[in-house]
């Protein structure tokens, strides 16, 4: 379901970029490291009407992907923002084409596009969910649980999230912290919706270990192999009963189509930052829906900006599995928006206000800003 009614163009006058350091409520450990502070870039599109906000979901180091904060900061200020400002007036649907000559840097492109889109929709008085074609007013909320010190600690953490009302549990795994951790959670909580996420920690040589996870009746195993291992993922998928879901490998509509053609995955995790923007994310949703492939919305520890946009995206009809659109309090004691996402009966509401549907808390934003720069025409 392509965007039915494109947004109006806006006259861009500048961009303000900020690097934020947001303390996490607890350390978040994956197969590639531990975060205690979320470093992220937020973008403010300055226009002749309402300003718009976006989020560049890079981290401090190039561990999840090749993108990282300082590289994103440089390419945004030196190349991508100036290219958009040179156009003067443009519609959100034109942002991707303007930025296409610049290779890669999808997270930066996504953040800039979202800021322009937010500004345009605020000017029109339209909500982002309406623009996307959302069919739900709230979305089921899953939670991502990092690697804990031992299986017992993991069970304690999962139990706390289930008590809060999360409807699906995802646990991070890595070699040596996979089968026993998964067994502990399954034994403790029975037939809860459960999936695991490897963040590319394995190779095809680990197929026997990964096959041991089949006995736990998981919803899926997410990104077991490296980002560029589409062929090996297809080989592994034939070996496992557990559905293989791709995350890091899906960087565009074409990558999604290639993965489906090869049989590399039977489920797709869609992250707007990873694929270059929310419009590309909608296109991947449409591709998968037409192919009968389930999708769900992944998370990148977003602030209230990206979390609101993710909720709107996850309200599309093809998102049939609970995603990582959790409450803001899962990661942050204090968010940078005035009305952070909250968990209500296992769901997060889709904002209905203009644009993103959330307003920035200027004091909270200033308190976590470590660098700020503005570029104008």
Task: Describe the residue ranges of each PLM region.
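Catalytic beta/alpha-barrel core
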Residues: 167-175, 193-200, 217-227, 243-252, ...
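N-terminal capping/lid subdomain adjacent to the active-site entrance of alpha/beta enzymes
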Residues: 2-194, 201-204, 208, 212-215, ...
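Shared catalytic-loop signature of beta/alpha-barrel
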Residues: 228-245, 250-347, 351
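Long, low-complexity, intrinsically disordered polar/charged segments
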Residues: 133-142, 186, 211-221, 256-274
């Amino acid at each position: 379901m392509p965007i039915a009614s494109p947004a109006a163009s806006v006259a861009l006058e500048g961009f303000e970029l900020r690097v934020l350091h947001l303390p996490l409520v607890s350390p978040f450990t994956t197969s590639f490291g531990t975060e205690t502070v979320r470093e992220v870039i937020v973008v403010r599109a300055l226009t002749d009407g309402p300003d718009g906000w976006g989020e560049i979901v890079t981290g401090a180091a190039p561990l999840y992907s090749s993108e990282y904060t300082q590289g994103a900061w440089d390419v945004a200020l030196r190349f991508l923002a100036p290219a958009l400002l040179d156009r003067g007036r443009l519609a959100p649907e034109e942002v991707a084409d303007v930025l296409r000559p610049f290779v890669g840097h999808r997270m930066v492109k996504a953040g800039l596009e979202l800021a322009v889109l937010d500004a345009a929709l605020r000017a029109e008085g339209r909500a982002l969910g309406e623009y996307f074609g959302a069919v739900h007013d709230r979305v089921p909320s899953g939670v991502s649980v990092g690697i804990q010190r031992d299986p017992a600690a993991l069970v304690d953490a999962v139990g706390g999230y289930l008590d809060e009302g999360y409807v699906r549990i995802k646990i991070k795994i890595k070699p040596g912290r996979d089968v026993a951790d998964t067994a502990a959670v399954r034994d403790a909580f029975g037939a809860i919706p459960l999936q695991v996420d490897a963040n590319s920690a394995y190779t095809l040589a680990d197929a026997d270990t990964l096959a041991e996870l089949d006995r736990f009746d998981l919803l899926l195993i997410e990104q077991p192999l490296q980002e560029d291992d589409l062929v090996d993922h297809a080989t592994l998928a034939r070996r496992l009963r557990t559905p293989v879901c791709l995350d890091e490998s899906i960087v565009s509509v074409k990558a999604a189509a290639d993965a489906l053609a090869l049989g590399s995955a039977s489920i797709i995790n869609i992250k707007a930052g990873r694929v270059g923007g929310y419009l590309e994310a909608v296109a991947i949703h449409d591709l998968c829906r037409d192919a009968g492939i389930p999708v769900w919305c992944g998370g990148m520890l977003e602030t209230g900006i990206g979390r609101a946009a993710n909720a709107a995206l996850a309200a599309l009809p093809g998102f049939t599995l609970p995603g990582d659109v959790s409450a803001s309090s899962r990661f942050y004691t204090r968010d940078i928006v005035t009305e952070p996402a909250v968990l209500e009966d296992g769901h997060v509401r889709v904002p209905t206000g203009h644009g993103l549907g959330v307003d920035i808390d200027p004091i909270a934003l200033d308190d976590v800003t470590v660098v700020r720069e503005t570029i104008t025409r």
